């Protein structure tokens, strides 16, 4: 078995340039996912980078942000061009950037 992202979710995350927007109420963040398991994120105040992995069995994306720690998106589901899940029990939606 390969480590890292599950094949289908990795293809979804990285397709068409790999850019996704997350609306966090007061700000929007843009995540960019790369084929090598790395990602970057930026918003109007900050930017960061790290590694991601997808646990297909448990439907979780783990984000390891360089120098800042790890957070997990649980209950991950891809539907209608969006990735829905929960981070710290808060609903989070990644929308494919056009």
Regions found by a protein language model. Name each.
Residues 97-98:
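Short, solvent-exposed mixed-charge patches
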Residues 23-34, 40-93:
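Contiguous, well-ordered beta-strand patches that form the walls/edges
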Residues 5-8, 36-40:
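Short, charged low-complexity linear motifs
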Residues 5-21:
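N-terminal helix-cap/turn-to-beta initiation motif at the start of protein domains
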């Amino acid at each position: 078995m390969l480590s890292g992202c599950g094949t289908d979710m990795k293809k979804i995350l990285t397709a068409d340039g790999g850019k996704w927007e997350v609306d966090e109420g007061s700000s929007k963040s843009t995540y960019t996912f790369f084929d090598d398991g790395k990602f970057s994120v930026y918003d109007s105040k900050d930017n960061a980078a790290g590694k991601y992995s997808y646990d297909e069995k448990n439907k979780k994306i783990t984000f390891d942000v360089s120098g800042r720690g790890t957070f997990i998106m649980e209950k991950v589901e891809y539907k209608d061009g969006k990735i829905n899940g929960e981070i710290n029990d808060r609903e989070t939606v990644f929308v494919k950037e056009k």
